[in-house]
A protein has these predicted regions:
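Active-site proximal loop and beta-alpha junction motif in alpha/beta enzyme cores
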Residues: 1-112, 124-176
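Short amphipathic alpha-helical face segments that pack within enzyme cores
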Residues: 117, 121-125
């Protein structure tokens, strides 16, 4: 969820789309976090970085990437008192200044293979911490995407595929 924000997308190749995910926010009240603190190094073991990409994210940068028990740690961080609306949780390993490996715990869902907003949040957190360049490849369990933080927002570029077809009725399209 991106809080009902309209996202701009464009085709940039065959089965490749870029989406402007918006301008990231870092102020404690925008994420939101329960108290006024520096969001670059949150006061949680591991000192994760807090970011909002229209939804809250908490990114840990770790070396021992594969041995993280997401099913145990994910819900603990998601429901931490610091996050009044709960949070998405990412564990990231910097592979080089242009590439990051990520595992995701999505709030309300659990372990997920991929997440666009999590990919953007991790990239932005890595850039804020001066670990990477503004344009990085994010490798997730479900595939890889490119994230490019520009002045007009964070651009997410990745593969697209047809997943379903259907017809929407006029009643479905009416807004209340």
């Amino acid at each position: 969820s991106t809080d009902g924000i309209i996202l701009i997308a464009k085709n940039v190749g065959v089965n490749l789309t870029s989406v402007n995910m918006g301008v990231p926010k870092f102020e404690w009240h925008d994420i939101p976090i329960s108290k006024k603190i520096n969001t670059l190094k949150l006061p949680i073991e591991g000192h994760p970085t807090g970011t909002s990409i229209g939804n809250p994210h908490c990114t840990f940068f770790v070396e021992d990437f594969e041995n993280i028990d997401l099913n145990k740690i994910g819900p603990e961080i998601e429901n931490h008192p610091l996050f009044p609306e709960r949070t998405n949780v990412q564990f990231a390993k910097i592979l080089d200044p242009n590439r990051i490996r990520v595992r995701v715990w999505e709030r309300g869902t659990g372990v997920t293979l991929a997440s666009g907003s999590s990919s953007c949040a991790v990239a932005v957190a890595a850039i804020r911490n001066e670990f990477t360049q503004n344009k990085v490849t994010v490798d997730l369990d479900g595939g890889s995407v490119e994230v490019n933080w520009q002045s007009d927002g964070v651009w997410l570029t990745g593969p697209t595929a047809h997943s379903f077809s259907g017809t929407l009725t006029k009643d479905f399209l009416k807004y209340e």
